[in-house]
Amino acid sequence: MEFITGRHIPRRTFLRGMGATVALPFLDAMIPAGRVWSRIADDALPTRLVAIEMVHGAAGCNEWGATQNLWSPEAVGRDFDLAPTSLSSLEPFRDYLTIISNTDVRMAEAYQPYEIGGDHFRSSAVFLTQSHPKQTEGSDVYVGTSLDQLYAQRFGQDTPIPSMQLCIENINQSGGCAYGYTCVYTDSISWASPTEPLPVIRDPRVAFDQLFGAGGTVEERVLRRRTNKSILDWITGRVAQLRRELGPNDIQRLDRYLDNVREIERRIQRTEAQNTSGESRELPEAPAGVPDSFEEHTRMMFDLQVLAFSSDVTRVFSLKMGRDSSARVFHESGSDRPFHPASHHGAREEAILDFAKINRYHVSMLPYFLEKLQGIQEGDTHLLDKTMIIYGSPMGDPNLHNHRRAPLFVAGGANGRLEGGLHLNTPDGTPMANAMLSLAHALGMDDMDSFGDSTAELSLSMPASTLTSTGS
């Protein structure tokens, strides 16, 4: 517990320059003298939320894959072994991990004969809404309000950006896809209302400029970009002035934050230079700011989220990790098959194991993010303690296009609302919406009585003795 003394500066202090607006991290100087750091920080900054969709299910959701614990561990409760699972890379963060196995996403299923075959084109819209999309190829879309947007509407309205939506692969939010469904359903996981899908950002440069480059006029922003100078070069005078007003701890915190801003900016600039050099690209259709490397692209997006959370520019992110129909090859995973063909494993054990390599590789991106959050101090603790990260898929076995035993886990402390270090295996037929309802309550939306097709709240601290003993 630390009491603050000295000069007070407003929480919403920005460093402004030509075509630049840089928010500040939470500093001691932002707390009125005589107040307690931890109490103010907890009151001022609600839980940060990240919702990540892994597309097209998991190898461990196949019946044979479940017996091999290819997705989640065999043991329930706290004494689980992650080694054989796709979550093995999360072992260093097991105390922040809540695995929720055996839930179904029934709203992604076909409800009418004419909807059969449209699983690819419904699923993403269902993940965070747990609602059944209206079949249409036009603009009269209808599904539900997503969990991230319900949270943003309640806890994100006093931040400069209520929420941001990111993606890794190319999307096309226009026209019809197939089986009578518009591509908007395929491409959107965040819905501000049942009829309002939110656009997503693939290019780290665009995301960076939204977070830090929104100041000044359009002409000033264009000029800043043309100079190829750092965004920080336009605020050096204001930084120097602010440093004279801060104590040693705040100066160190400010310098580290600005160093992180500059570091991600340099990486984006290097990527743009590489991708406009005339050399051939693995992703020729991608914007110049998008790395050809899946890992580097994902890390850039995670780093931008950490910066946004530390400066409270936004408290809510969603991230779509890919597309169901992706033909991308993830060589680093150890599989040389394109994603979508690999997912259709034909129930062959060797092919199921091959797809599990891709699942494991995708999950292995997350520890980088968790470590970065853990490295940002805020009050008496760090950002990982104050963040909830939902990671899952609305698809179960991709080979069958079913939505049973869908993969889902949660990472982070959620401001003390999640115990962590726990594997829950729900009874057969439990809707994923039950888990989402409980997560909404953990986020502070305690007055929500239902969500999607939920039937009850799911206890996130269920005693291991009351659970079954089969993983998935």
What are these regions (language model features)?
Residues M1-S472:
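Ligand-binding pockets and gating/stacking loops
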